[in-house]
């Protein structure tokens, strides 16, 4: 797609935007993301996706629009680049701005809401100019033909370099180190699962289908004293999140994790946690910790990492697991599109194996995401064939899940999914509902649920009005699990 403005025209637009306020999504006031979207809309007539600013490089398909570059110490940002700050900014949501000037040591940007007051009227914080030191947790985005790159910016905290130039000393580049895993062996006490009689033949890697709060420690708290009736619903050998590994079963024990006798008896099951609730960066870190633990165990058992020793849950039974890993590393969503095809299954296994082998060799692998994956959301987007349309023009489909509200009240409607329908009540922050239906109507995505005999309709994000499968959805106003 050709940008609507030339580079010089876009720079002029940035200059004229100074002192103005932008609230493109009409939500949470004048955020930095709104200012990025204002520029993107001027350039392409499109809006960027992502729950927070930090998600922009991963939540959007930049084919034909922008190119991703890895920054190097001698890389110089250009006017018009979009800079994206990581999760260590903006209370975990990151920050985004437009570059108008740069050296190897600092960038000068146009930005909005750097000080965090944009969620209110924020009139004292309109779009303005700021100066930032280069930081390793930044990314920058460049448009094709406009030189607006997505690049990683190195970290520079030496203020002296801003004023005094001097020859660079050649220094040895520090080698990355693997995180130190915190392995907690606390075997479940509600039932003594039988022994295998030998070491495992390999490892089955799972995605837990857990929420943001479903950490390894949370599983430990919920399962370590659970009765047999709960364990029969499923228990893996280890649960991994962050740098924590909770070992729930001894290596010698059979697990109940594949719904298959061979998988349960001969393979060690590891759950990558938070697969329905974590953002992509968090989930990818959980994966890396899992690969590191797999490498440790395989070396302990004297096994190589190959297609026989590294297995997927969907090899043993018809399941979408590992669903999140499938989307991220193959671009195929087994939740909405059906069982993972064999070529995608092998693609995912080979990715796992390559990562694990690197750890076994004492190296630190780099996590990669398929260019076929939007890598933008952990919410399920249904396929077009699942939607139906009623006489009122409402697109609807069956879907059962739990929605947990974010930090703002939402007006619930009765009768139907229209903003003109009677008000039911105010759905409070932190509240949740178990819904059975999803609808597209009146500029919003709605979920339908029944409470105390009354049917309610709750909007949970915006919708651009396009029919499935071409709908464009706004940020989710909470979490789905």
UniProtKB/Swiss-Prot annotation:
<dbReference type="GO" id="GO:0001897">
    <property type="term" value="P:symbiont-mediated cytolysis of host cell"/>
</dbReference>
<keyword id="KW-0511">Multifunctional enzyme</keyword>
<dbReference type="Pfam" id="PF05257">
    <property type="entry name" value="CHAP"/>
</dbReference>
<dbReference type="GO" id="GO:0008745">
    <property type="term" value="F:N-acetylmuramoyl-L-alanine amidase activity"/>
</dbReference>
<keyword id="KW-0479">Metal-binding</keyword>
<keyword id="KW-0081">Bacteriolytic enzyme</keyword>
<dbReference type="InterPro" id="IPR003646">
    <property type="entry name" value="SH3-like_bac-type"/>
</dbReference>
<keyword id="KW-0862">Zinc</keyword>
<keyword id="KW-0645">Protease</keyword>
<dbReference type="Pfam" id="PF01510">
    <property type="entry name" value="Amidase_2"/>
</dbReference>
<feature type="binding site">
    <location>
        <position position="34"/>
    </location>
    <ligand>
        <name>Ca(2+)</name>
    </ligand>
</feature>
<dbReference type="InterPro" id="IPR002502">
    <property type="entry name" value="Amidase_domain"/>
</dbReference>
<feature type="binding site">
    <location>
        <position position="321"/>
    </location>
    <ligand>
        <name>Zn(2+)</name>
    </ligand>
</feature>
<keyword id="KW-0204">Cytolysis</keyword>
<feature type="domain" description="SH3b">
    <location>
        <begin position="398"/>
        <end position="466"/>
    </location>
</feature>
<dbReference type="Pfam" id="PF08460">
    <property type="entry name" value="SH3_5"/>
</dbReference>
<dbReference type="GO" id="GO:0006508">
    <property type="term" value="P:proteolysis"/>
</dbReference>
<keyword id="KW-0578">Host cell lysis by virus</keyword>
<feature type="active site" description="For endopeptidase activity">
    <location>
        <position position="95"/>
    </location>
</feature>
<dbReference type="InterPro" id="IPR007921">
    <property type="entry name" value="CHAP_dom"/>
</dbReference>
<keyword id="KW-0378">Hydrolase</keyword>
<dbReference type="InterPro" id="IPR038765">
    <property type="entry name" value="Papain-like_cys_pep_sf"/>
</dbReference>
<feature type="domain" description="N-acetylmuramoyl-L-alanine amidase">
    <location>
        <begin position="197"/>
        <end position="323"/>
    </location>
</feature>
<feature type="active site" description="For endopeptidase activity">
    <location>
        <position position="111"/>
    </location>
</feature>
<dbReference type="GO" id="GO:0042742">
    <property type="term" value="P:defense response to bacterium"/>
</dbReference>
<feature type="domain" description="Peptidase C51">
    <location>
        <begin position="7"/>
        <end position="142"/>
    </location>
</feature>
<dbReference type="GO" id="GO:0008233">
    <property type="term" value="F:peptidase activity"/>
</dbReference>
<comment type="function">
    <text>Endolysin that degrades host peptidoglycans and participates in the sequential events which lead to the programmed host cell lysis releasing the mature viral particles. Exhibits lytic activity against Staphylococcus aureus. The CHAP activity cleaves the peptidic bond between the D-alanine of the tetra-peptide stem and the first glycine of the penta-glycine cross-bridge. The N-acetyl-muramidase activity cleaves between N-acetylmuramic acid and N-acetylglucosamine bonds.</text>
</comment>
<feature type="binding site">
    <location>
        <position position="206"/>
    </location>
    <ligand>
        <name>Zn(2+)</name>
    </ligand>
</feature>
<feature type="binding site">
    <location>
        <position position="313"/>
    </location>
    <ligand>
        <name>Zn(2+)</name>
    </ligand>
</feature>
<keyword id="KW-1188">Viral release from host cell</keyword>
<dbReference type="InterPro" id="IPR036505">
    <property type="entry name" value="Amidase/PGRP_sf"/>
</dbReference>
<dbReference type="GO" id="GO:0046872">
    <property type="term" value="F:metal ion binding"/>
</dbReference>
<keyword id="KW-0106">Calcium</keyword>
<keyword id="KW-0929">Antimicrobial</keyword>
<comment type="similarity">
    <text>Belongs to the N-acetylmuramoyl-L-alanine amidase 2 family.</text>
</comment>
<feature type="active site" description="For endopeptidase activity">
    <location>
        <position position="32"/>
    </location>
</feature>
<protein>
    <recommendedName>
        <fullName>Endolysin LytA</fullName>
        <ecNumber>3.4.22.-</ecNumber>
        <ecNumber>3.5.1.28</ecNumber>
    </recommendedName>
</protein>
<dbReference type="GO" id="GO:0009253">
    <property type="term" value="P:peptidoglycan catabolic process"/>
</dbReference>
